[in-house]
Amino acid sequence: MKNSISRFIIISLVLMCLMGALIYKLHEVTIVEGAQYAEAAANTSTSSIDIKGTRGRILDRNGVVLAYSKNSYNVEFLRDADNRTDYDSATYTDSLIKAIKIIEDGGGKTIDTSYIRLGEDGKLKYEWGVKSRAAQVARYKNFCQSMGFNISESLKKNEKIEDKSKWDTSTWPTAEEAYTKLRALWFIPEDLPFEDANKVISIRQEVLLNNYRAYEPITIAYDVSMEVVAEIKLRADELTGLQTSQSTTRVYPRGTTAAHILGYLGRTATEEMVKEKGYSYDDYIGVSGIEYTMEEYLTGSTNERKGERVLEKNKNGSAIRELSYTPAKDGDDVMLTIDINLQTVVEKALEDLIAKIDEKEEKQLLERYADYEKATNDDVEGIKTAKTGAAVVMNVNTGQVLAMASYPSFNPNWFIAGLSPEQNQELFNSEFSVETTPTRNKAISTKLAPGSIFKMATGVAAAAEGVLDINERISCDYEYIIKYTDENGNEKTIEQNAPKCHLNSRSKIGQHANQTLADAIKNSCNYYFCEAAYRLGIDKLNEWAGKFGLTSRTGIELTGETEGIVGGQKVLFDNTLTGEDGTLDIANQKTSLPGLVYRKLKETLVKFVESRNAEVDEEAINRCAKRLMELQDGDITNKGPEIRRIISEEIDIPEGITQMRKDWINSISSLLNEIQWKPTQTIRAGFGQGTTLVTPVAVARYVSALANRGTVYDVHIVDKVMDSSGSTVKNVAPSVYNQIEISDDIWDAVSSGMKGVVSPEDGGTASSAFKDYPEFRKKYIDTEMFGGKTGSAQIGRRAKNIDIENTSWFVTFAPREQPEIAIVICVPYGLSGSSSVPAIVDILTYYFGQSENAAPENLVAINGLTE
């Protein structure tokens, strides 16, 4: 019993000692050391850093890299949100001035995004970087609010107006006022010149515009040298807010080659892209070309691609340890359909061709200057010569683009570093660039009259619709005069503006006698296709142009494509087209003629009102002009009563007055007559003139359909998309836009006619142009390897003995029996269609040469196997 009590006492004492020790330790941890832990916790923090994936590459069809991102270093500026005193602001400005000098001494340059610019007159002005007034006002507002300028009273009034273009910004700070305020706000030294001060303003402006993401640094210089990186790090103590970071820089290793296809990048992220997709305002994103259209695949900067690094930092902001790391996902690679070697050949061929034509035209102008002066009494400099052009090579069996050239070109690498004033001048503001628009892809965005290359479409349509047999023989009569029977059974003719055949003389019409469809294509006889178009009618001609894909976008994965037009009342002028305000839409008509007529009508109506000494009401004049134009529906009936009624209702001129002033009604009727489709316009459309306009890329798929006998493909320049491991993310398979089902006899006639165009034996219109290429002629023409068609669409004045302002077209497909490719060459102001023959020779020589080298008998045997 005693032993049990003793054991109990001993155990109790031990437990009490242990409990005491535990209580003491708990006291020490919570009370004594707690303050230390609390202090340590207060001196540490966590921060997360977004990690962006590398932008994907752009490759040609064989895997050759056309665009990639290389590792580089940037200089960044991060303003501590807690440091907002005047002293802090002055310190940041001093640091930026020093950093800018370091960067520039190291061969780099800082961002130049300030909205404040120095005009040619020496006065400060705003440049908002957007064209529309509404967009300018939106940026102006954001700028003022971000910079802390008080415009609240003005906004109260303006925000009641939905249309920002109508906002009154007259009380907002001028560029001069803003510049003065910002220099003072940021303590920019008074002796610092404008050019250097504005560099500081650019950086500080970006910080405030990015204020709601103030934790993100602003990149102030891209792709700087290692010397700059070392200097920034060495002087870190005096460069408050400055740091360097590893990044990537986009590189286009082939410079100007394929520039219009690849496009370029810019720091153009919108607020929506930043908030919804996770982009930073510093991110470079696609602005044009493949870089733009395939942005969602190429980018590594969106939320779904970005990774994250979570760091623990001490009170000085230095990282203590990494708490977590989520790797970023790189952007996908985009493989194109183009062959970069063929692309290079095509671009060189086009550039050489334009230079050759331009030289020939300049020589012709000098030789015939006297005749020009007599004919026009004008300055010879008014005539334009070849300066631009486009070329497309397409796989006729898939619709894939193998090469696409636009001249002149540009270097997309320039946009990465930011355009220098000299580069900006060269691309956008020089006399040459204004005339030639180097950054515009003319293969998809330029619409031009096709001229004679459209004749195959007219011929196929007429034969397929049964209004003309392919073997029917039609003889040229030089001038095509429309003959018809009126409602009273009387024979009538329309001789005004009668189109002529290209023979240029009635004495030569025997050369175009008894022509079949194939003959007419070979001879390029305007008369024949006027007859075909007249029988067919404009509606059917429009329909068939649509079937060939000439009046719609092709679907190519590039920005800026426009669609072609042929003709008809709705094309010339559509009186049913209305705008957002419910009235007739003039601006979005398919041709420019309605705009001209609208202005003329308003001028005429103003004269009517002023002749009566009445006050001119501009809104009433506008309404009246539009209502008058709505009368033009293509019907030829007399519209006099309706004209008088509308004038009376809108501008208060009684019908009794206009009844007496028949000259007034006649002048209105004459203007309305300008926007009425006429039979003479139908026949001109038949040989690719008049209102007919097409793009080179649409012509390429049209010629492809002629070659493959009826399959009109959607056009593609993207082959597939692959992730960073090489797995296919998206495959772009050939797709059919339309299938034309007609008899083989019609296709045979077209093929035969196009063969004849280049054949010396057949005396085709382009045959003589190949005389300077005897080897090519012997190897490829004499063996009937390809067929072609020239086009010389008139686009300018035509003085005596001077006829150079024509668009030069040459289209071809090859080989003729089993076609593989279609080629389109287009040179505005290019003299004549046959002028483009040198480029065709260069491209086909390369293409046929590559095919011959790839023939089985020419392949090299390795270890007994043929590769």
Summary of predicted features, one role per range:
Residues N83-Y87, D358, C530, R797, ...:
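A generic structural signal for short coil/turn motifs at secondary-structure boundaries
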Residues S727-S735, V841-E867:
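Short, gly/Ser/Thr-rich active-site loops of penicillin-recognizing serine hydrolases
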Residues E271-V274, R797-N801, V824, S834-V837:
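Short conserved micro-motifs at the rims of enzyme active sites and ligand-binding pockets
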Residues M1-G331, M335, I340-A390, V396, ...:
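Membrane-proximal periplasmic segments of bacterial cell-envelope enzymes
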Residues A67-Y68, Y73, V310-P327, I338, ...:
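Beta-lactam-recognizing serine transpeptidase/beta-lactamase-like catalytic domain environment
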Residues P828-Y847:
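Amphipathic oligomerization regions
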Residues E361-Y372, E472-C476, D539, H716, ...:
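Short, glycine/acidic-rich hinge or "gate" loops at secondary-structure transitions
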Residues D352-E359, E674, N708, G756, ...:
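Conserved helix-loop functional segments at active or binding sites
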